[in-house]
Amino acid sequence: MTDDYELLDSGDGRKLERFGRYVLARPCSQAMWRPAKSAAEWAKADASFDREDGNNWHGRANLPKEWQIETAGVRFKLGGTDFGHLGIFPEQRAQWRWIRQRVGEVVSGQRPRSEDAAGTVLPRVLNLFA
């Protein structure tokens, strides 16, 4: 299973993450410790988001408007928002794995399933996060 997400470092109220081929530095208020990587490593990020600087992306031109990654066996379409989010929260990966497993069980016939008028299998999942 491919995992295009990686937490590279965190500290000083920020996190350094890899989403596919792009490395991003974003705020993380819980990261109150010192980062393990050097400032030079953090400076290599393709883009960074800063709340102290008026909620601005720096280097946003280095990112495509949208791109896809796969993590926890699920493919996601990402894009930077004006408030520093990308459209997913990687800390939810355990839930995505669970959802993927349940959908697989429905599709394979291991769990009860419903079908639409055309006979297409319709797994039913309600993810109330966010």
Model-derived features: positions:
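Single, functionally critical "micro-switch" positions that shape active/binding sites
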Residues: 19-20, 128
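Non-catalytic substrate-recognition/targeting regions of SAM-dependent transferases
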Residues: 2-17, 24-90, 97-100
